[in-house]
């Protein structure tokens, strides 16, 4: 699709979203066609909700998020086939794999293990592996990435190349509020089991999160070497574990010591060469 066509599509969707109270299941024509076209672009990886520039800054294509939201107004509930034991679901969003056969899977080039769930408009790149996991609509999963068992990739989340999302990891989805950016895991990151990254936070390239690290917008991310406290973004090639910090007030009103509060701790930073040659367990050893 040309830049002119994309601009026209964006204009139609922006106007429809501004007038969304009048968009419903009876809406036909240009608006429905535009939303369908946008969802297809997302599904095929030809457009992304967020894109990284050469300067490392991520730009959010809000109009694509709006297309996803409009699709809920346009589409009725329907039976979704493919459940275990020939069971079905009841939803507005079909499976990405609806009507797929051998040819489609071979062309797509990724592995989809039984009981993984991928909703339409999510993109899965070649050589990715989906264990029994959940990938929500509008998400992007990069080439060679592993989405391990019971991991969740939320709506519009952006997962880079050669990322490992370990068992039970949660990558939060962000559709609303509209101004919020998606949660982003950049290339070559390792996210340890049962960790959670949510609320549009960014884990920069090559970083390692140990097991059970939770990062949201209000989570303190503390660099142990410098004492710097940051929020919302883990720097490139950081090794991060769960930790705690003393409260601002050393004692409570009753005289007892104040409880320590959770934080994420950057225990070390490594360069790209070290990261590529060093095992994950070795990096996480203190």
Swiss-Prot record:
Pfam families, per the entry: Hexapep_2 (PF14602), THDPS_N_2 (PF14805)
Main localization (coarse): cytoplasm
A GO molecular-function descriptor: 2,3,4,5-tetrahydropyridine-2,6-dicarboxylate N-succinyltransferase activity
Name of the top EC class for this enzyme: transferase
Keyword terms of this UniProt record: Acyltransferase, Amino-acid biosynthesis, Cytoplasm, Diaminopimelate biosynthesis, Lysine biosynthesis, Repeat, Transferase
Family: Belongs to the transferase hexapeptide repeat family.
Protein name (Swiss-Prot/TrEMBL): 2,3,4,5-tetrahydropyridine-2,6-dicarboxylate N-succinyltransferase
């Amino acid at each position: 699709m040309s830049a002119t066509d994309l601009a026209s599509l964006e204009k139609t969707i922006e106007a429809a979203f501004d007038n969304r109270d009048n968009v419903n299941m009876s809406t036909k024509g240009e608006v429905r066609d535009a939303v369908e076209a946008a969802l297809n672009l997302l599904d095929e990886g030809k457009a992304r909700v967020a894109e990284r520039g050469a300067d490392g800054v991520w730009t959010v294509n809000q109009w694509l998020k709006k297309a996803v939201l409009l699709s809920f107004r346009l589409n009725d509930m329907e039976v979704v086939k493919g459940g275990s034991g020939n069971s079905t679901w009841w939803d507005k969003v079909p499976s990405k794999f609806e009507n797929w056969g051998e040819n489609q899977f071979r062309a797509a080039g990724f592995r989809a293990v039984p009981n993984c769930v991928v909703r339409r408009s999510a993109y899965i790149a070649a050589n990715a592996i989906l264990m029994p996991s959940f990938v929500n609509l509008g998400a992007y999963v990069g080439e060679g990435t592993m989405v391990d068992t019971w991991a969740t990739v939320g709506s519009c989340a952006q997962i880079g190349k050669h990322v490992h999302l370990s068992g039970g990891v949660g990558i939060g989805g962000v559709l609303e509020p509209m101004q919020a950016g998606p949660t982003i895991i950049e290339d070559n990151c390792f996210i340890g089991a049962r960790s959670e990254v949510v609320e549009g936070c960014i884990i920069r390239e090559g970083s390692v999160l140990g097991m059970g690290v939770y990062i949201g917008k209000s989570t303190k991310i503390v660099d142990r070497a410098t004492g710097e406290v940051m929020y919302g973004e883990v720097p490139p090639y950081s090794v991060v574990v769960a930790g705690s910090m003393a409260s601002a007030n050393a004692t409570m009103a009753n005289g007892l010591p104040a409880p320590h509060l959770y934080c994420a701790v950057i225990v070390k930073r490594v360069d790209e060469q070290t990261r590529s040659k060093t095992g994950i367990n070795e990096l996480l050893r203190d």
